[in-house]
Amino acid sequence: MGDLPGSGSTAQPRDAAVTGTGGNSTAGGGSSVGSTAVDRPPSPARLSHTSEKHPKVTLTELNMLRRHRELCDVVLNVGGRKIFAHRVILSACSSYFCAMFTGELEESRQTEVTIRDIDENAMELLIDFCYTAHIMVEESNVQTLLPAACLLQLVEIQDICCEFLKRQLDPTNCLGIRAFADTHSCRELLRIADKFTQHNFQEVMESEEFLLLPVGQLVDIICSDELNVRSEEQVFNAVMSWLKYNVAERRQHLAQVLQHVRLPLLSPKFLVGTVGSDLLVRSDEACRDLVDEAKNYLLLPQERPLMQGPRTRPRKPTRRGEVLFAVGGWCSGDAIASVERFDPQTNDWKMVAPMSKRRCGVGVAVLNDLLYAVGGHDGQSYLNSIERYDPQTNQWSCDVAPTTSCRTSVGVAVLDGFLYAVGGQDGVQCLNHVERYDPKENKWSKVAPMTTRRLGVAVAVLGGFLYAIGGSDGQCPLNTVERYDPRHNKWVAVSPMSTRRKHLGCAVFNNYIYAVGGRDDCMELSSAERYNPLTNTWSPIVAMTSRRSGVGLAVVNGQLYAVGGFDGSAYLKTIEVYDPETNQWRLCGCMNYRRLGGGVGVMRAPQTENYMWCENSFKQPNS
Protein backbone atom coordinates (compact mmCIF):
# COMPACT_ATOMS: atom_id res chain seq x y z
CA MET A 1 0.00 0.00 0.00
CA GLY A 2 1.38 3.42 -0.91
CA ASP A 3 2.31 6.02 1.71
CA LEU A 4 -0.07 8.80 2.61
CA PRO A 5 0.96 12.31 1.59
CA GLY A 6 3.71 13.58 3.90
CA SER A 7 4.69 10.11 5.13
CA GLY A 8 8.38 9.65 5.82
CA SER A 9 8.66 12.96 7.74
CA THR A 10 7.60 14.04 11.18
CA ALA A 11 5.00 16.78 11.29
CA GLN A 12 4.83 19.17 14.19
CA PRO A 13 1.59 20.66 15.53
CA ARG A 14 0.89 24.00 13.88
CA ASP A 15 1.11 25.96 17.14
CA ALA A 16 4.03 24.05 18.75
CA ALA A 17 7.06 26.06 19.93
CA VAL A 18 10.25 24.02 19.79
CA THR A 19 13.49 25.05 21.50
CA GLY A 20 16.52 23.05 20.47
CA THR A 21 19.88 22.52 22.19
CA GLY A 22 21.86 25.73 22.37
CA GLY A 23 18.77 27.85 21.72
CA ASN A 24 17.47 30.65 23.92
CA SER A 25 13.91 31.23 25.08
CA THR A 26 12.82 34.10 27.21
CA ALA A 27 9.70 33.91 29.34
CA GLY A 28 9.10 36.26 32.23
CA GLY A 29 12.74 37.31 32.10
CA GLY A 30 14.00 33.74 32.65
CA SER A 31 15.77 31.40 30.27
CA SER A 32 15.77 27.70 29.60
CA VAL A 33 18.46 25.77 27.81
CA GLY A 34 18.10 22.24 26.43
CA SER A 35 14.32 21.87 27.04
CA THR A 36 11.25 21.59 24.75
CA ALA A 37 7.97 23.37 25.53
CA VAL A 38 4.73 22.54 23.62
CA ASP A 39 1.77 24.93 23.97
CA ARG A 40 -1.78 23.43 23.78
CA PRO A 41 -3.70 24.64 20.67
CA PRO A 42 -6.53 27.02 21.47
CA SER A 43 -9.97 25.44 21.94
CA PRO A 44 -12.61 26.32 19.33
CA ALA A 45 -15.28 28.76 20.45
CA ARG A 46 -18.10 26.50 19.05
CA LEU A 47 -18.60 22.98 17.74
CA SER A 48 -21.85 22.53 15.84
CA HIS A 49 -23.39 19.09 15.41
CA THR A 50 -26.66 17.87 13.88
CA SER A 51 -27.47 14.22 14.34
CA GLU A 52 -28.97 12.43 11.36
CA LYS A 53 -29.78 9.44 13.55
CA HIS A 54 -31.65 11.35 16.22
CA PRO A 55 -35.09 11.70 14.54
CA LYS A 56 -35.22 8.03 13.60
CA VAL A 57 -33.93 6.85 16.97
CA THR A 58 -36.37 9.11 18.80
CA LEU A 59 -39.33 7.90 16.74
CA THR A 60 -38.28 4.30 17.29
CA GLU A 61 -38.10 4.82 21.06
CA LEU A 62 -41.43 6.64 21.13
CA ASN A 63 -43.02 3.79 19.20
CA MET A 64 -41.57 1.28 21.67
CA LEU A 65 -43.12 3.28 24.52
CA ARG A 66 -46.44 3.21 22.68
CA ARG A 67 -46.23 -0.51 22.05
CA HIS A 68 -45.60 -1.07 25.76
CA ARG A 69 -48.36 1.46 26.64
CA GLU A 70 -45.90 3.59 28.58
CA LEU A 71 -46.38 7.35 29.02
CA CYS A 72 -49.41 7.18 26.71
CA ASP A 73 -51.90 9.94 27.51
CA VAL A 74 -54.74 9.11 25.13
CA VAL A 75 -56.61 6.03 23.94
CA LEU A 76 -58.39 6.14 20.58
CA ASN A 77 -61.51 4.01 20.41
CA VAL A 78 -62.07 3.14 16.74
CA GLY A 79 -64.72 0.59 15.88
CA GLY A 80 -64.31 -1.01 19.30
CA ARG A 81 -60.53 -1.26 18.94
CA LYS A 82 -58.41 0.65 21.48
CA ILE A 83 -55.27 2.31 20.12
CA PHE A 84 -52.85 3.80 22.69
CA ALA A 85 -50.90 6.91 21.71
CA HIS A 86 -49.27 10.17 22.78
CA ARG A 87 -51.19 13.38 22.14
CA VAL A 88 -48.07 15.34 21.24
CA ILE A 89 -47.10 12.89 18.48
CA LEU A 90 -50.60 12.80 17.00
CA SER A 91 -50.88 16.59 17.15
CA ALA A 92 -47.51 17.07 15.47
CA CYS A 93 -48.49 14.80 12.58
CA SER A 94 -52.16 15.61 12.07
CA SER A 95 -53.97 18.95 11.94
CA TYR A 96 -57.12 17.06 12.89
CA PHE A 97 -55.60 15.82 16.16
CA CYS A 98 -53.88 19.14 16.79
CA ALA A 99 -57.24 20.93 16.68
CA MET A 100 -58.81 18.23 18.86
CA PHE A 101 -56.18 18.23 21.61
CA THR A 102 -55.08 21.88 21.75
CA GLY A 103 -58.45 23.62 21.50
CA GLU A 104 -61.48 23.86 23.72
CA LEU A 105 -63.13 20.67 22.45
CA GLU A 106 -64.33 18.17 25.01
CA GLU A 107 -61.85 15.61 23.64
CA SER A 108 -58.95 17.79 24.78
CA ARG A 109 -59.75 16.79 28.35
CA GLN A 110 -60.60 13.14 27.74
CA THR A 111 -58.16 10.27 28.13
CA GLU A 112 -60.25 8.07 25.83
CA VAL A 113 -61.57 9.49 22.57
CA THR A 114 -64.00 7.80 20.21
CA ILE A 115 -63.34 8.33 16.50
CA ARG A 116 -66.26 7.56 14.22
CA ASP A 117 -66.63 7.10 10.46
CA ILE A 118 -63.18 5.59 10.00
CA ASP A 119 -61.96 2.06 9.45
CA GLU A 120 -60.08 0.67 12.45
CA ASN A 121 -57.43 -1.06 10.32
CA ALA A 122 -56.81 2.13 8.38
CA MET A 123 -56.55 4.11 11.62
CA GLU A 124 -54.00 1.67 12.99
CA LEU A 125 -51.90 1.96 9.83
CA LEU A 126 -52.02 5.75 10.01
CA ILE A 127 -51.05 5.86 13.69
CA ASP A 128 -48.18 3.49 12.89
CA PHE A 129 -47.10 5.92 10.16
CA CYS A 130 -47.05 8.80 12.66
CA TYR A 131 -44.54 6.84 14.75
CA THR A 132 -42.52 5.08 12.02
CA ALA A 133 -42.77 7.22 8.86
CA HIS A 134 -43.59 4.01 6.97
CA ILE A 135 -46.80 2.77 5.39
CA MET A 136 -47.69 0.12 2.82
CA VAL A 137 -50.48 1.12 0.43
CA GLU A 138 -51.99 -1.75 -1.53
CA GLU A 139 -55.14 -2.70 -3.37
CA SER A 140 -56.70 -4.25 -0.28
CA ASN A 141 -56.45 -1.11 1.89
CA VAL A 142 -56.34 1.96 -0.36
CA GLN A 143 -60.13 2.46 -0.36
CA THR A 144 -60.16 2.75 3.44
CA LEU A 145 -56.81 4.51 3.82
CA LEU A 146 -57.62 7.43 1.55
CA PRO A 147 -60.84 8.54 3.32
CA ALA A 148 -59.14 8.05 6.69
CA ALA A 149 -56.16 10.15 5.60
CA CYS A 150 -58.56 12.83 4.33
CA LEU A 151 -60.36 12.90 7.69
CA LEU A 152 -57.13 13.12 9.68
CA GLN A 153 -55.68 15.65 7.21
CA LEU A 154 -52.59 13.53 6.58
CA VAL A 155 -51.80 15.12 3.22
CA GLU A 156 -48.73 13.00 2.55
CA ILE A 157 -50.75 9.78 2.82
CA GLN A 158 -53.50 11.25 0.65
CA ASP A 159 -50.89 11.92 -2.03
CA ILE A 160 -49.44 8.40 -1.75
CA CYS A 161 -52.89 6.82 -2.04
CA CYS A 162 -53.71 8.95 -5.08
CA GLU A 163 -50.39 8.01 -6.68
CA PHE A 164 -51.13 4.34 -6.07
CA LEU A 165 -54.60 4.65 -7.65
CA LYS A 166 -53.15 6.56 -10.59
CA ARG A 167 -50.86 3.61 -11.29
CA GLN A 168 -53.79 1.21 -11.14
CA LEU A 169 -55.81 3.00 -13.82
CA ASP A 170 -57.09 0.85 -16.65
CA PRO A 171 -60.23 0.95 -18.82
CA THR A 172 -62.12 -1.42 -16.52
CA ASN A 173 -61.68 0.66 -13.35
CA CYS A 174 -60.97 4.27 -14.36
CA LEU A 175 -64.60 5.34 -13.93
CA GLY A 176 -64.75 3.89 -10.43
CA ILE A 177 -61.48 5.58 -9.50
CA ARG A 178 -62.80 8.82 -10.97
CA ALA A 179 -65.94 8.64 -8.80
CA PHE A 180 -63.84 7.75 -5.74
CA ALA A 181 -61.57 10.75 -6.36
CA ASP A 182 -64.57 13.03 -6.79
CA THR A 183 -66.14 11.81 -3.53
CA HIS A 184 -62.98 12.53 -1.54
CA SER A 185 -62.10 15.81 -3.31
CA CYS A 186 -58.82 14.48 -4.73
CA ARG A 187 -58.64 16.98 -7.56
CA GLU A 188 -55.38 15.80 -9.13
CA LEU A 189 -56.49 12.16 -9.20
CA LEU A 190 -59.86 13.26 -10.59
CA ARG A 191 -58.10 15.20 -13.35
CA ILE A 192 -55.92 12.25 -14.29
CA ALA A 193 -58.80 9.77 -14.19
CA ASP A 194 -60.82 12.10 -16.43
CA LYS A 195 -57.94 12.38 -18.85
CA PHE A 196 -57.38 8.63 -18.86
CA THR A 197 -61.07 8.05 -19.58
CA GLN A 198 -61.08 10.55 -22.43
CA HIS A 199 -57.93 9.22 -24.05
CA ASN A 200 -58.95 5.56 -23.76
CA PHE A 201 -62.65 6.03 -24.42
CA GLN A 202 -62.80 3.31 -27.07
CA GLU A 203 -61.84 0.72 -24.46
CA VAL A 204 -63.68 2.35 -21.54
CA MET A 205 -67.02 2.27 -23.39
CA GLU A 206 -66.82 -1.54 -23.46
CA SER A 207 -66.43 -1.86 -19.68
CA GLU A 208 -69.16 -2.75 -17.21
CA GLU A 209 -68.42 0.42 -15.26
CA PHE A 210 -69.44 2.45 -18.30
CA LEU A 211 -72.79 0.68 -18.56
CA LEU A 212 -73.45 1.42 -14.87
CA LEU A 213 -72.73 5.16 -15.09
CA PRO A 214 -75.32 7.63 -13.77
CA VAL A 215 -76.63 9.86 -16.54
CA GLY A 216 -74.83 12.93 -15.19
CA GLN A 217 -71.42 11.28 -15.30
CA LEU A 218 -72.09 9.93 -18.80
CA VAL A 219 -72.87 13.44 -20.01
CA ASP A 220 -69.71 14.80 -18.35
CA ILE A 221 -67.65 12.30 -20.34
CA ILE A 222 -69.22 12.54 -23.79
CA CYS A 223 -69.44 16.34 -23.85
CA SER A 224 -65.64 16.67 -23.66
CA ASP A 225 -63.77 18.05 -26.67
CA GLU A 226 -60.85 15.82 -25.64
CA LEU A 227 -62.71 12.55 -26.20
CA ASN A 228 -60.35 10.35 -28.19
CA VAL A 229 -62.44 8.65 -30.88
CA ARG A 230 -61.84 7.85 -34.52
CA SER A 231 -65.33 9.11 -35.42
CA GLU A 232 -68.50 10.37 -33.77
CA GLU A 233 -70.11 7.03 -34.62
CA GLN A 234 -68.28 5.53 -31.64
CA VAL A 235 -69.85 8.09 -29.30
CA PHE A 236 -73.34 7.35 -30.59
CA ASN A 237 -72.78 3.59 -30.28
CA ALA A 238 -71.51 4.05 -26.72
CA VAL A 239 -74.58 6.08 -25.76
CA MET A 240 -76.95 3.49 -27.22
CA SER A 241 -75.12 0.65 -25.44
CA TRP A 242 -75.53 2.53 -22.16
CA LEU A 243 -79.21 3.22 -22.89
CA LYS A 244 -80.08 -0.35 -23.84
CA TYR A 245 -78.44 -1.72 -20.69
CA ASN A 246 -81.55 -0.48 -18.85
CA VAL A 247 -84.03 0.86 -21.40
CA ALA A 248 -86.98 1.06 -19.04
CA GLU A 249 -85.31 3.55 -16.71
CA ARG A 250 -83.01 5.32 -19.13
CA ARG A 251 -85.08 6.06 -22.24
CA GLN A 252 -86.35 9.21 -20.52
CA HIS A 253 -82.76 10.54 -20.62
CA LEU A 254 -82.11 9.80 -24.32
CA ALA A 255 -82.61 13.37 -25.58
CA GLN A 256 -80.56 14.78 -22.69
CA VAL A 257 -77.67 12.51 -23.62
CA LEU A 258 -78.05 12.59 -27.41
CA GLN A 259 -77.69 16.37 -27.52
CA HIS A 260 -74.03 15.87 -26.53
CA VAL A 261 -73.37 13.49 -29.44
CA ARG A 262 -72.12 15.58 -32.36
CA LEU A 263 -74.61 14.28 -34.90
CA PRO A 264 -73.68 16.85 -37.61
CA LEU A 265 -70.21 15.27 -37.73
CA LEU A 266 -71.58 11.83 -38.64
CA SER A 267 -71.52 10.54 -42.20
CA PRO A 268 -74.85 10.97 -44.02
CA LYS A 269 -75.13 7.22 -44.40
CA PHE A 270 -74.73 6.58 -40.67
CA LEU A 271 -76.97 9.49 -39.69
CA VAL A 272 -79.87 8.32 -41.86
CA GLY A 273 -79.36 4.57 -41.84
CA THR A 274 -78.45 4.05 -38.18
CA VAL A 275 -79.40 7.06 -36.06
CA GLY A 276 -82.51 8.15 -37.91
CA SER A 277 -83.87 4.62 -38.19
CA ASP A 278 -83.43 3.71 -34.51
CA LEU A 279 -86.85 3.14 -32.93
CA LEU A 280 -85.92 4.82 -29.65
CA VAL A 281 -84.68 7.91 -31.48
CA ARG A 282 -87.69 8.04 -33.79
CA SER A 283 -90.11 7.79 -30.87
CA ASP A 284 -88.72 10.90 -29.13
CA GLU A 285 -89.58 14.31 -30.57
CA ALA A 286 -86.51 16.05 -29.13
CA CYS A 287 -84.28 13.34 -30.61
CA ARG A 288 -85.93 13.72 -34.01
CA ASP A 289 -85.21 17.45 -33.85
CA LEU A 290 -81.53 16.72 -33.21
CA VAL A 291 -81.42 14.40 -36.23
CA ASP A 292 -83.12 17.02 -38.42
CA GLU A 293 -80.61 19.62 -37.29
CA ALA A 294 -77.77 17.32 -38.32
CA LYS A 295 -79.38 16.61 -41.70
CA ASN A 296 -79.70 20.33 -42.40
CA TYR A 297 -76.04 20.83 -41.52
CA LEU A 298 -75.00 18.12 -43.96
CA LEU A 299 -77.41 19.08 -46.75
CA LEU A 300 -76.89 22.84 -46.63
CA PRO A 301 -73.13 23.49 -46.64
CA GLN A 302 -73.70 27.15 -47.55
CA GLU A 303 -75.57 27.62 -44.26
CA ARG A 304 -72.95 25.98 -42.04
CA PRO A 305 -71.29 29.23 -40.90
CA LEU A 306 -74.64 30.16 -39.31
CA MET A 307 -75.13 26.76 -37.70
CA GLN A 308 -71.91 26.51 -35.70
CA GLY A 309 -72.16 25.35 -32.09
CA PRO A 310 -70.94 22.71 -29.64
CA ARG A 311 -72.38 19.88 -31.78
CA THR A 312 -70.52 21.00 -34.91
CA ARG A 313 -67.14 21.42 -33.21
CA PRO A 314 -64.74 18.55 -34.01
CA ARG A 315 -63.23 16.78 -31.05
CA LYS A 316 -59.49 16.92 -30.51
CA PRO A 317 -58.36 13.32 -30.21
CA THR A 318 -54.98 12.49 -28.74
CA ARG A 319 -52.10 12.40 -31.14
CA ARG A 320 -50.83 8.90 -30.80
CA GLY A 321 -47.15 8.50 -30.08
CA GLU A 322 -44.81 6.49 -32.27
CA VAL A 323 -43.52 3.03 -31.45
CA LEU A 324 -40.52 1.14 -32.80
CA PHE A 325 -40.65 -2.44 -34.07
CA ALA A 326 -37.57 -4.70 -34.11
CA VAL A 327 -38.09 -7.53 -36.59
CA GLY A 328 -36.22 -10.82 -36.96
CA GLY A 329 -32.43 -10.94 -37.07
CA TRP A 330 -29.75 -13.38 -35.95
CA CYS A 331 -29.59 -14.52 -32.32
CA SER A 332 -27.68 -17.33 -30.58
CA GLY A 333 -26.51 -18.87 -33.82
CA ASP A 334 -29.81 -18.91 -35.69
CA ALA A 335 -32.23 -16.71 -37.58
CA ILE A 336 -35.28 -15.70 -35.55
CA ALA A 337 -38.91 -14.85 -36.34
CA SER A 338 -39.63 -12.91 -33.15
CA VAL A 339 -40.83 -9.31 -33.26
CA GLU A 340 -40.97 -6.82 -30.42
CA ARG A 341 -42.25 -3.30 -29.99
CA PHE A 342 -40.56 -0.43 -28.14
CA ASP A 343 -42.62 2.36 -26.60
CA PRO A 344 -40.38 5.35 -25.76
CA GLN A 345 -42.98 6.73 -23.36
CA THR A 346 -42.64 3.71 -21.09
CA ASN A 347 -39.14 2.67 -22.18
CA ASP A 348 -40.49 -0.90 -22.43
CA TRP A 349 -40.11 -3.63 -25.03
CA LYS A 350 -43.15 -5.90 -25.51
CA MET A 351 -43.34 -9.02 -27.67
CA VAL A 352 -45.88 -8.98 -30.49
CA ALA A 353 -46.92 -11.65 -32.98
CA PRO A 354 -43.90 -13.35 -34.64
CA MET A 355 -43.46 -13.66 -38.38
CA SER A 356 -44.33 -16.95 -40.07
CA LYS A 357 -40.68 -17.36 -41.17
CA ARG A 358 -37.33 -16.83 -39.50
CA ARG A 359 -35.58 -13.91 -41.16
CA CYS A 360 -32.13 -12.37 -40.68
CA GLY A 361 -30.82 -9.72 -43.04
CA VAL A 362 -34.46 -8.75 -43.48
CA GLY A 363 -35.49 -5.41 -44.95
CA VAL A 364 -38.21 -3.56 -43.05
CA ALA A 365 -40.29 -0.49 -43.88
CA VAL A 366 -43.72 0.99 -43.13
CA LEU A 367 -46.20 1.67 -45.93
CA ASN A 368 -49.80 2.81 -45.36
CA ASP A 369 -49.59 2.07 -41.61
CA LEU A 370 -48.55 -1.53 -42.27
CA LEU A 371 -45.12 -3.01 -41.50
CA TYR A 372 -43.43 -4.95 -44.33
CA ALA A 373 -40.69 -7.56 -43.81
CA VAL A 374 -38.89 -8.23 -47.09
CA GLY A 375 -36.68 -11.22 -47.91
CA GLY A 376 -33.83 -12.21 -45.62
CA HIS A 377 -32.34 -15.61 -44.81
CA ASP A 378 -34.08 -18.25 -42.67
CA GLY A 379 -30.88 -20.03 -41.63
CA GLN A 380 -31.00 -22.44 -44.58
CA SER A 381 -32.11 -20.56 -47.68
CA TYR A 382 -32.39 -17.11 -49.19
CA LEU A 383 -35.92 -15.69 -49.27
CA ASN A 384 -37.99 -13.68 -51.71
CA SER A 385 -41.20 -13.90 -49.66
CA ILE A 386 -42.79 -10.89 -47.97
CA GLU A 387 -44.85 -10.60 -44.80
CA ARG A 388 -47.02 -7.69 -43.74
CA TYR A 389 -47.95 -6.78 -40.15
CA ASP A 390 -51.11 -4.96 -39.06
CA PRO A 391 -50.65 -3.42 -35.58
CA GLN A 392 -54.41 -3.02 -35.14
CA THR A 393 -54.94 -6.79 -35.24
CA ASN A 394 -51.43 -7.87 -34.16
CA GLN A 395 -51.31 -10.28 -37.10
CA TRP A 396 -48.93 -11.00 -39.98
CA SER A 397 -50.23 -11.84 -43.45
CA CYS A 398 -48.34 -13.51 -46.28
CA ASP A 399 -50.54 -12.39 -49.18
CA VAL A 400 -47.95 -9.93 -50.52
CA ALA A 401 -46.37 -10.76 -53.88
CA PRO A 402 -42.74 -11.97 -53.56
CA THR A 403 -39.80 -10.02 -54.94
CA THR A 404 -38.44 -11.08 -58.32
CA SER A 405 -35.13 -12.07 -56.69
CA CYS A 406 -34.24 -13.71 -53.39
CA ARG A 407 -32.59 -11.10 -51.21
CA THR A 408 -30.85 -10.97 -47.85
CA SER A 409 -28.92 -8.01 -46.42
CA VAL A 410 -31.31 -5.93 -48.50
CA GLY A 411 -32.17 -2.26 -48.08
CA VAL A 412 -35.87 -1.37 -48.00
CA ALA A 413 -37.54 2.07 -48.03
CA VAL A 414 -40.75 3.83 -49.07
CA LEU A 415 -40.81 6.58 -51.69
CA ASP A 416 -43.92 8.13 -53.27
CA GLY A 417 -46.20 5.33 -52.09
CA PHE A 418 -43.97 2.53 -53.42
CA LEU A 419 -41.88 0.05 -51.42
CA TYR A 420 -38.33 -0.25 -52.80
CA ALA A 421 -36.01 -3.25 -52.35
CA VAL A 422 -32.39 -2.30 -53.00
CA GLY A 423 -29.36 -4.58 -53.48
CA GLY A 424 -28.57 -7.47 -51.14
CA GLN A 425 -27.40 -10.92 -52.15
CA ASP A 426 -29.25 -13.93 -53.54
CA GLY A 427 -26.85 -16.71 -52.51
CA VAL A 428 -25.00 -16.59 -55.82
CA GLN A 429 -23.92 -13.00 -56.17
CA CYS A 430 -24.08 -9.55 -54.68
CA LEU A 431 -26.89 -7.58 -56.31
CA ASN A 432 -27.32 -4.16 -57.83
CA HIS A 433 -30.95 -4.93 -58.74
CA VAL A 434 -33.65 -2.54 -57.53
CA GLU A 435 -37.38 -3.22 -57.65
CA ARG A 436 -40.43 -1.55 -56.23
CA TYR A 437 -43.79 -2.76 -54.94
CA ASP A 438 -47.14 -1.20 -55.80
CA PRO A 439 -49.58 -2.02 -52.96
CA LYS A 440 -52.58 -1.23 -55.16
CA GLU A 441 -51.55 -3.79 -57.76
CA ASN A 442 -49.79 -6.17 -55.33
CA LYS A 443 -46.97 -6.31 -57.84
CA TRP A 444 -43.19 -5.81 -57.97
CA SER A 445 -41.51 -4.20 -60.97
CA LYS A 446 -37.85 -3.52 -61.69
CA VAL A 447 -36.41 -0.02 -61.94
CA ALA A 448 -32.94 1.13 -62.94
CA PRO A 449 -30.14 -0.85 -61.22
CA MET A 450 -27.54 0.82 -59.04
CA THR A 451 -24.14 1.58 -60.53
CA THR A 452 -22.53 -0.61 -57.83
CA ARG A 453 -23.45 -4.01 -56.42
CA ARG A 454 -24.25 -3.65 -52.72
CA LEU A 455 -25.07 -6.09 -49.92
CA GLY A 456 -25.47 -4.89 -46.37
CA VAL A 457 -26.51 -1.57 -47.89
CA ALA A 458 -28.41 1.10 -45.98
CA VAL A 459 -31.13 3.10 -47.71
CA ALA A 460 -32.84 6.39 -46.91
CA VAL A 461 -35.36 8.74 -48.52
CA LEU A 462 -34.77 12.49 -48.43
CA GLY A 463 -35.92 15.29 -50.70
CA GLY A 464 -37.69 12.97 -53.12
CA PHE A 465 -34.57 10.85 -53.70
CA LEU A 466 -33.72 7.29 -52.63
CA TYR A 467 -30.17 7.00 -51.28
CA ALA A 468 -28.11 3.79 -51.26
CA ILE A 469 -25.31 4.12 -48.72
CA GLY A 470 -22.24 1.96 -48.24
CA GLY A 471 -22.54 -1.80 -48.07
CA SER A 472 -20.17 -4.28 -49.67
CA ASP A 473 -19.60 -5.19 -53.31
CA GLY A 474 -18.91 -8.78 -52.30
CA GLN A 475 -15.20 -8.15 -51.88
CA CYS A 476 -14.78 -5.18 -49.57
CA PRO A 477 -16.84 -2.61 -47.67
CA LEU A 478 -17.83 0.57 -49.50
CA ASN A 479 -17.96 4.23 -48.58
CA THR A 480 -19.64 5.24 -51.83
CA VAL A 481 -23.16 6.65 -51.97
CA GLU A 482 -25.59 6.96 -54.86
CA ARG A 483 -29.11 8.26 -55.11
CA TYR A 484 -32.09 7.36 -57.27
CA ASP A 485 -34.32 9.92 -58.95
CA PRO A 486 -37.71 8.29 -59.66
CA ARG A 487 -38.60 11.08 -62.10
CA HIS A 488 -35.75 10.10 -64.40
CA ASN A 489 -35.31 6.46 -63.31
CA LYS A 490 -31.61 7.08 -62.81
CA TRP A 491 -28.92 6.60 -60.17
CA VAL A 492 -26.26 9.29 -59.62
CA ALA A 493 -23.23 9.21 -57.31
CA VAL A 494 -22.98 11.75 -54.48
CA SER A 495 -20.21 12.41 -51.97
CA PRO A 496 -18.83 9.29 -50.28
CA MET A 497 -18.76 8.73 -46.53
CA SER A 498 -15.51 9.26 -44.67
CA THR A 499 -15.52 5.60 -43.56
CA ARG A 500 -16.18 2.34 -45.39
CA ARG A 501 -19.24 0.68 -43.85
CA LYS A 502 -21.24 -2.47 -44.53
CA HIS A 503 -24.22 -3.62 -42.44
CA LEU A 504 -24.56 -0.06 -41.15
CA GLY A 505 -27.61 1.69 -39.77
CA CYS A 506 -29.13 4.63 -41.58
CA ALA A 507 -31.99 7.10 -40.96
CA VAL A 508 -33.14 10.60 -41.89
CA PHE A 509 -33.14 12.96 -38.91
CA ASN A 510 -33.63 16.75 -38.99
CA ASN A 511 -33.00 16.82 -42.78
CA TYR A 512 -29.70 14.97 -42.50
CA ILE A 513 -28.95 11.35 -43.37
CA TYR A 514 -27.27 9.66 -40.43
CA ALA A 515 -25.01 6.65 -41.00
CA VAL A 516 -23.82 4.78 -37.90
CA GLY A 517 -21.82 1.70 -37.04
CA GLY A 518 -21.34 -1.16 -39.47
CA ARG A 519 -18.06 -2.87 -40.25
CA ASP A 520 -15.03 -1.76 -42.25
CA ASP A 521 -12.18 -3.96 -43.50
CA CYS A 522 -11.01 -4.79 -39.98
CA MET A 523 -13.59 -4.38 -37.24
CA GLU A 524 -17.05 -3.44 -36.10
CA LEU A 525 -17.55 0.32 -35.83
CA SER A 526 -19.01 2.70 -33.28
CA SER A 527 -18.32 5.81 -35.36
CA ALA A 528 -21.10 7.84 -36.95
CA GLU A 529 -21.46 10.58 -39.54
CA ARG A 530 -24.19 12.54 -41.27
CA TYR A 531 -24.87 13.81 -44.78
CA ASN A 532 -26.07 17.30 -45.66
CA PRO A 533 -27.83 17.18 -49.06
CA LEU A 534 -27.62 20.97 -49.43
CA THR A 535 -23.82 20.97 -49.36
CA ASN A 536 -23.32 17.36 -50.53
CA THR A 537 -20.93 16.74 -47.63
CA TRP A 538 -20.50 14.23 -44.81
CA SER A 539 -19.41 15.32 -41.34
CA PRO A 540 -18.62 13.19 -38.27
CA ILE A 541 -20.73 13.10 -35.12
CA VAL A 542 -19.83 11.57 -31.78
CA ALA A 543 -19.41 7.79 -31.76
CA MET A 544 -21.98 5.47 -30.20
CA THR A 545 -21.25 3.93 -26.81
CA SER A 546 -20.84 0.47 -28.42
CA ARG A 547 -19.48 -0.91 -31.65
CA ARG A 548 -22.47 -2.08 -33.70
CA SER A 549 -22.51 -3.96 -36.99
CA GLY A 550 -25.89 -5.10 -38.29
CA VAL A 551 -27.48 -2.26 -36.32
CA GLY A 552 -30.96 -0.85 -36.87
CA LEU A 553 -31.40 2.93 -36.89
CA ALA A 554 -34.72 4.76 -36.67
CA VAL A 555 -36.29 8.05 -35.61
CA VAL A 556 -39.07 7.70 -33.02
CA ASN A 557 -40.96 10.72 -31.67
CA GLY A 558 -38.16 13.02 -32.80
CA GLN A 559 -35.30 10.97 -31.32
CA LEU A 560 -32.70 8.84 -33.08
CA TYR A 561 -32.38 5.25 -31.82
CA ALA A 562 -29.66 2.67 -32.57
CA VAL A 563 -30.91 -0.87 -31.97
CA GLY A 564 -28.99 -4.11 -31.41
CA GLY A 565 -26.17 -5.32 -33.66
CA PHE A 566 -22.85 -7.11 -33.06
CA ASP A 567 -19.86 -5.55 -31.26
CA GLY A 568 -17.22 -8.04 -32.42
CA SER A 569 -17.68 -10.47 -29.55
CA ALA A 570 -21.38 -10.56 -28.67
CA TYR A 571 -24.79 -10.02 -30.19
CA LEU A 572 -26.41 -6.96 -28.64
CA LYS A 573 -29.87 -6.29 -27.27
CA THR A 574 -29.05 -2.80 -25.99
CA ILE A 575 -30.38 0.36 -27.59
CA GLU A 576 -29.02 3.87 -27.42
CA VAL A 577 -30.45 7.26 -28.31
CA TYR A 578 -28.70 10.27 -29.83
CA ASP A 579 -29.22 13.85 -28.64
CA PRO A 580 -28.20 16.34 -31.36
CA GLU A 581 -28.25 19.23 -28.87
CA THR A 582 -25.47 17.71 -26.78
CA ASN A 583 -24.01 15.54 -29.56
CA GLN A 584 -24.10 12.54 -27.21
CA TRP A 585 -25.40 8.98 -27.22
CA ARG A 586 -26.87 7.38 -24.10
CA LEU A 587 -28.02 3.85 -23.38
CA CYS A 588 -31.76 3.56 -22.81
CA GLY A 589 -32.77 -0.03 -22.23
CA CYS A 590 -32.63 -3.49 -23.75
CA MET A 591 -34.71 -5.60 -26.09
CA ASN A 592 -35.95 -9.02 -25.03
CA TYR A 593 -33.82 -10.64 -27.76
CA ARG A 594 -30.30 -9.99 -28.99
CA ARG A 595 -30.49 -9.09 -32.68
CA LEU A 596 -27.90 -8.87 -35.46
CA GLY A 597 -29.23 -7.91 -38.87
CA GLY A 598 -32.78 -7.36 -37.71
CA GLY A 599 -34.98 -4.78 -39.36
CA VAL A 600 -36.58 -1.78 -37.66
CA GLY A 601 -39.73 0.16 -38.48
CA VAL A 602 -41.64 3.02 -36.86
CA MET A 603 -45.42 3.34 -36.69
CA ARG A 604 -48.08 5.26 -34.82
CA ALA A 605 -49.17 3.47 -31.67
CA PRO A 606 -52.40 1.66 -32.59
CA GLN A 607 -55.69 2.30 -30.81
CA THR A 608 -56.04 -1.16 -29.31
CA GLU A 609 -56.47 -2.52 -25.81
CA ASN A 610 -52.71 -3.00 -25.60
CA TYR A 611 -52.17 0.76 -25.59
CA MET A 612 -53.66 2.56 -22.61
CA TRP A 613 -52.90 6.24 -22.15
CA CYS A 614 -51.88 7.31 -18.67
CA GLU A 615 -50.29 10.53 -17.47
CA ASN A 616 -46.96 10.76 -19.36
CA SER A 617 -47.04 7.08 -20.18
CA PHE A 618 -48.80 4.20 -21.84
CA LYS A 619 -50.00 1.43 -19.55
CA GLN A 620 -50.28 -2.23 -20.41
CA PRO A 621 -53.42 -3.83 -18.98
CA ASN A 622 -52.78 -6.10 -16.03
CA SER A 623 -49.07 -5.39 -16.12
Swiss-Prot record:
Disordered: annotated span: 1-54
BACK domain span: 174-276
UniProt feature, compositional bias: Gly residues: 20-32
Gene Ontology CC, one term: Cul3-RING ubiquitin ligase complex
Gene3D superfamilies listed in its UniProt record: 1.25.40.420, Kelch-type beta propeller, Potassium Channel Kv1.1, Chain A
Protein name: Kelch-like protein diablo
Kelch repeats: 323-369, 371-417, 418-464, 466-511, 513-558, 559-605
UniProt function note: Probable substrate-specific adapter of an E3 ubiquitin-protein ligase complex which mediates the ubiquitination and subsequent proteasomal degradation of target proteins. May have a role in synapse differentiation and growth.
UniProt xrefs under PANTHER family: KELCH PROTEIN, KELCH-LIKE PROTEIN 20
Residues with PTM Phosphothreonine: 19
Domain BTB residues, every copy: 72-139
GO process annotations (BP): negative regulation of synaptic assembly at neuromuscular junction; proteasome-mediated ubiquitin-dependent protein catabolic process; protein ubiquitination
